[in-house]
Amino acid sequence: MHYTIKLSQMRIGVDLDGVVADFTDGWTSQYEKDFGKKISENDITEWGLAKPLTHFEEEVDFWNWAKDIDGASIFRNLKTYNNAIEVLVDLSLKGHEIVIISSKPWWSIHDTLMWLGENKIPSKEIHFTE
């Protein structure tokens, strides 16, 4: 006997930062460029460590800096992880629905939408949370 297994269409929720977009490299590279201090990814062991690893006294100071870097937020020019876009495109071409779910500050939504378009992320549905 020969059996064929057909996978049904999946609805896949995908986060951006740390999954598709390399937020850590983005902010540490920009921080080194702006302030001359290199922060290794090995120094970052959990979320929210920007304050002790940088000169910023409060977390809000970090986000105020990240809000306007040469006229755009830190989220505008993040690099993607290797093969992340290709995997999403492949899943989409196979009939699966890609839903973007991302926690973002309100001021970064425009830049994030531009980033999604420029990187041709195959999604028709996007949810932002804070």
What label would you give each PLM region?
Residues H110-D111, G117, I121:
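PIN-domain endoribonuclease scaffold, especially VapC-family toxins
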